[in-house]
Amino acid sequence: MGEPARWQRRVEEFVLGQIGDSPTRVLEVGCGEGELALALARAGHSVTAIDPRAPEGPIFRRARIEEFTDPGQFDHVVASLSLHHVEDLSMALDNIADLLRPGGTLIVVEFAWDRIDEAMAEWALDRLPAASPSEKPSWLGRCCRGWTRGGEGGSHYHGDDAEAHFAGWAGEEGLHNSRQVRAELERHLVERHFEWVPYLYPDLGDGVSESDESAAIESGTINATGFRYVGTRRALAEP
């Protein structure tokens, strides 16, 4: 199993661990190609998966979370790498809170691009697989190689600082940063679980594992750029 597949398996394990074994009603926001939604359905849950480009299939609907409606409420809402993409984050979380039953949970897996500093970018750059003309480079490869130019003797020349470079990329992509995402989560829900986790290793070379990135995080060499969050819907009387 390659690292991208292992990362997806970790996400599935985390989400299923939060949901439990009893069949529940689950909404996935930003389902992409549908791997996680299908895994949840195979586990016995009643799944509705939305995305503006959702695939065909009975559990999938092409919709944006800001406008999505449903006649019922959900036991769980799952958002894996989708909240930083939504156009109106506050509106999206307003709707998610309304779609959750009282006591229902929002389960989030997210990317904190704003925690990529120079040390993080250098660490990733040194571990990127060699560029191949026959393969489309990953987002990380494009960003890191766009930040640096080869210098004499194999040295690197950086046109700007890493934070500014990645902020420029995120601005072009319309991405929210992790501080914005966490602030809106705090405003709409009650936090039950939060942890920083490795995120970059699936896009690095074959020899770089989750444990390698974890060790670099634990030693203070690099920042963690992934996080997991679980929150419950606020009671109507709560501020």
Task: Please report, for each region that a protein language model flagged, where it lies by residue.
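A short glycine-rich, Lys/Arg-flanked "PGG" loop and its adjoining helix->strand segment in the class I
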Residues: 91-102
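A conserved beta-strand element that flanks and buttresses the S-adenosyl-L-methionine
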Residues: 78
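Class I SAM-dependent methyltransferase SAM/SAH-binding core
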Residues: 32-67
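C-terminal lobe and adjacent flexible extensions of AdoMet/dcAdoMet transferase-like proteins
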Residues: 188-239
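Substrate-binding/catalytic lobe of Class I Rossmann-like enzymes that use SAM or dcSAM, i.e.
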Residues: 137-207
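Conserved class I S-adenosyl-L-methionine
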Residues: 24-32, 107-142, 150
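Conserved alpha-helix/loop element of class I SAM-dependent methyltransferases that forms part
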Residues: 5-22
